A protein has these predicted regions:
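Enzymes that bind and transform nitrogen-containing heteroaromatic metabolites
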Residues: 1-184
Length: 184
């Protein structure tokens, strides 16, 4: 299969101020939602590879032993460490990563963090599953994309990446949580 057979899906739950983490770099309780978590876990189970930042990897042990690609400036390029693959994007191009890890194509799940979301926006998402916890404002912390730190909305970044939104779906009415899937 060609590189076009690689299907990249991003996943994030964000606050009304487009944040994915608090000022300590952690996902706050206000962004944890059982309906979103169940959907997210199902999507990770469908993936052939999960691309995650080093901090996310350290904070979320790979208990289900999913095939994981950890993005880190500390990697030599593309290397295997235990059951995970580690990748330094500046040292090894994405096409080499996919040739090695997904030679027959497949689905890549991207759960973040910010630098990882930014990188895959450049590589090209097929879809981005954007969950929003309405009524939640963090006020400080990490935003979804670097451009959001400069005032852009998450939606404008996704639109600029060539994605278009489907109709929002309420996944938890009591908590006022919606999911919008943006697709190419």
């Amino acid at each position: 299969m060609s590189a076009s057979a690689i299907h990249i899906h991003g996943y994030a739950i964000i606050s009304d101020d487009d944040r994915i983490a608090d000022s300590n770099g952690r996902t706050p309780r206000s962004l944890r939602n059982e309906a979103d978590w169940a959907r997210f876990q199902h999507e990770l189970d469908r993936a052939d590879l999960v691309a995650i930042g080093r901090l996310g990897h350290q904070a979320n042990p790979n208990a289900k032993h999913r095939r994981r690609l950890v993005l880190s400036r500390g990697a030599a390029g593309l290397e295997q460490r235990g059951e995970e693959w580690w990748w330094h994007p500046a040292k090894t191009p994405w096409r080499e990563v996919t040739a090695m890890l997904l030679p027959d194509g497949g689905r890549v799940a991207v759960p973040g963090g910010q630098a990882v979301f930014d990188l895959f926006a450049e590589i090209g998402y097929e879809a981005f599953h954007l969950t929003r916890a309405h009524g939640v404002l963090l006020g400080a912390g990490r935003r979804l994309f670097t451009a959001c730190e400069r005032g852009a909305s998450a939606e404008s970044v996704l639109n600029g990446a060539g994605l278009r939104p489907a109709a929002p779906e309420t996944i938890d009415a009591a908590a006022n949580v919606t999911l919008t899937i943006w697709r190419r």
